[in-house]
Amino acid sequence: MDIRIIYSIQDAVGKTIKELGYKFEEINEDIIDFRYEKGDVIVVFSRHESSSKIPSLTVHYPGNPIDKTMGGEPKKLGIAFPSLLTSIYREIRKINIDIEKAIEATHHGPTYQHIPIIFVEIGSSKEYWENKELVKTLIEATLRGIDKYKDIECENKIVGFGGTHYTPYFSLLAEKSCVGHIISKYYLAELSNEVILQTVNNTIEKIDTVMFDNVNSKIREKIVNLLATYKLNFKFR
């Protein structure tokens, strides 16, 4: 598997990576709207921004679940790679630093590529984006996750609906299951049939379980009925 690791020189974390001397591939494009597509998989290091400014280390897939976009195309999800994302996340969880660690729900672009993209991010302010020791620690954990992904335990390969953006429930499930796309509660009311199908189709590993985190019965029924022919397990919380 040809896994390409990239950063953008337009991105604050990318600039720190360059200063550290890592020989990853450098792009000069918007980190949420790039067109780069080489290898079999792309792992992207970038900054994470949030209004709360809470320090964090996060992983997620790109995708715009509804018409509103942040780079990429509307109603388009990227390609998921559950065992690789989960392997990276499990190594990040081992970092002995008091900082939030989470799998984020699917959001922002790019969505143009036909291969999996996984974002590995540092949040949520300049203080952390430019912290060379923290950036180095995150890179080393990510590289360990890449090395181990073929051997990790995956009781199930799941997609998730509901919960908040930082997905505490699905992040917890990643201790034993491998995680594909997660659609947070904020998008569910506007979610099209097409995007629901993409959650299980846009992946290079077969999904076997759909998890719901406090989703109302009407939306839950819509999703279950639409995915009924896929022979999936449905679990509710």
Curated annotation (Swiss-Prot):
Its cofactor is Zn(2+). Binds 2 Zn(2+) ions per subunit. It is an enzyme of class 3 (hydrolase). Transmembrane segments: none annotated. NCBIfam families: PRK03995.1-1. Belongs to the DtdA deacylase family. HAMAP family: Deacylase_DtdA. This is D-aminoacyl-tRNA deacylase.
